[in-house]
């Protein structure tokens, strides 16, 4: 559960750091993100500890739509479903038959999935951004301007102008790598995709 929470759920951030972002990097990243109003893809997710030892590997499908809508389904045997309707987030764990519901934190540093589905017009207020390009791949490294976030740095990689993968590194060096395949942008997604109906008999936790 930690992996999906790291990507999609918030933590408290209280201390501001001094940082900066190159205006050209900010403009280019913002343009790449904003041109996709919807995204659908398969994903594979790999988590390694600080020494490079594999901790967990999962796969699934995701759908995103601006502003703030997302559907993130992890396949069995570690099945989970996270759905945001833009106001609240529902996390369904079928093994526990439990739904956790909480308000969506709109801050990009607290809910990294919003980088792909939220308002990124003021992204430089949240991150120090640098970029590099090689072999047709554009990498952007984002470092939060606050302490006590879930991650110390986040990398977004684009191939041919489309999101290809992302990596999150936490304070102890643990890396979560997410590779997207079959990416489709700006195709209509049914509104029902972003609505979660609580299964009958499920335990409900409101946070």
Curated annotation (Swiss-Prot):
From the UniProt annotation, give the residues forming the signal peptide: 1-21
What are the entry keywords? Chaperone, Periplasm, Protein transport, Signal, Transport
Do you know which Pfam families this protein is assigned to?
LolA
The protein's superkingdom reads Bacteria
> Does the keyword field hold RNA-binding?
no
The main place the protein resides is periplasm
Which GO cellular component terms, listed alphabetically, does the Swiss-Prot or TrEMBL entry include? Answer: outer membrane-bounded periplasmic space
Q: Which GO terms describe its biological process?
A: lipoprotein localization to outer membrane; lipoprotein transport
Where is this chain's protein located in or outside the cell? Periplasm
Q: Which family does it belong to?
A: Belongs to the LolA family.
Please give the function described in this protein's UniProt entry.
Participates in the translocation of lipoproteins from the inner membrane to the outer membrane. Only forms a complex with a lipoprotein if the residue after the N-terminal Cys is not an aspartate (The Asp acts as a targeting signal to indicate that the lipoprotein should stay in the inner membrane).
Which NCBIfam families does this entry report, sorted A to Z?
lolA
Q: How does it assemble?
A: Monomer.
Q: How is this protein named in the record?
A: Outer-membrane lipoprotein carrier protein
What is the species of this protein?
Pseudomonas fluorescens (strain ATCC BAA-477 / NRRL B-23932 / Pf-5)
Taxonomic placement: Bacteria, Pseudomonadati, Pseudomonadota, Gammaproteobacteria, Pseudomonadales
């Amino acid at each position: 559960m930690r992996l999906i929470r790291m990507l999609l759920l918030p933590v408290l951030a209280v201390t501001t750091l001094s940082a900066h972002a190159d205006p050209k990097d900010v403009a280019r990243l913002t343009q790449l993100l904003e041109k996709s109003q919807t995204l659908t893809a398969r994903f594979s997710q790999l988590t390694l500890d600080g020494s490079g030892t594999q901790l967990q590997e999962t796969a699934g499908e995701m759908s995103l739509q601006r502003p703030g809508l997302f559907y993130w389904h992890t396949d069995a045997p570690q099945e989970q479903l996270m759905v945001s309707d833009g106001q609240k987030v529902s996390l369904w764990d079928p093994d526990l038959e439990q739904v956790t519901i909480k308000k969506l934190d709109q801050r990009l540093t607290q809910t990294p999935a919003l980088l792909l589905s939220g308002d990124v017009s003021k992204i430089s207020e949240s991150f120090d951004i640098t970029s590099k390009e090689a072999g047709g791949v554009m990498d952007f490294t984002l470092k939060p301007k606050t302490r006590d976030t879930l991650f110390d740095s986040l990398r977004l990689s684009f191939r041919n102008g489309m999101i290809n993968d992302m990596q999150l590194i936490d304070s102890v060096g643990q890396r979560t790598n997410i590779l997207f395949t079959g990416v489709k942008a700006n195709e209509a997604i049914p509104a029902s995709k972003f609505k979660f109906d609580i299964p009958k008999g499920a335990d409900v936790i409101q946070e």
